From Swiss-Prot:
It comes from the Eukaryota. Belongs to the universal ribosomal protein uS15 family. Keywords: Ribonucleoprotein, Ribosomal protein. GO terms for biological process: cytokinesis by cell plate formation; leaf morphogenesis; translation; trichome morphogenesis. It comes from Arabidopsis thaliana (Mouse-ear cress). The keyword Ribonucleoprotein applies. It holds the Pfam family Ribosomal_S15. This is Small ribosomal subunit protein uS15y. HAMAP family: Ribosomal_uS15_A.
Length: 151
């Protein structure tokens, strides 16, 4: 499947391990992983950042193979899940940064065009999340209040 607003096909990706069980060399228990996930979430890290830290620093290749559930499910169980999904949050953050840039550089036509593309992506993603009930049905993206969502 191709990219939304560019020409790339996006075919490169890392291969997931075939074996879905926990590696034999891993000595960490699922309770330890749960506690560390909660600790990192309380520090303000996103689920993907938590996964990267667990992989790189703690040697946990896949949280799902160790605990049986994904990072976001663990965060939801402990009440630490973000209210806005992570990918939507980063798109809103990008739109706020582009708007801030456009306040200083009014004639930047390319940034104006890119802002339109980013905001259309936000609207499309918000429609999906409303349909899957990850966002409330009355949630709406507005460029005037977007900076408060990201701050």
């Amino acid at each position: 499947m191709g990219r939304m607003h560019s020409r790339g096909k996006g075919i490169s990706a890392s291969a997931l391990p075939y074996k879905r069980s926990s590696p034999s060399w891993l000595k960490t228990t699922s309770q330890d992983v749960d506690e560390s996930i909660c600790k990192f979430a309380k520090k303000g890290l996103t689920p993907s950042q938590i996964g990267v830290i667990l992989r790189d620093s703690h040697g946990i290749p896949q949280v799902k193979s160790v605990t049986g559930s994904k990072i976001l499910r663990i965060l939801k169980a402990h009440g630490l899940a973000p209210e806005i999904p992570e990918d939507l949050y980063h798109l809103i953050k990008k739109a706020v940064a582009i708007r801030k840039h456009l306040e200083r550089n009014r004639k930047d036509k390319d940034s104006k065009f890119r802002l339109i593309l980013v905001e259309s992506r936000i609207h499309r993603l918000a429609r999906y999340y409303k349909k899957t009930k990850k966002l409330p049905p009355v949630w709406k993206y507005e460029s005037t209040t977007a900076s408060t969502l990201v701050a």
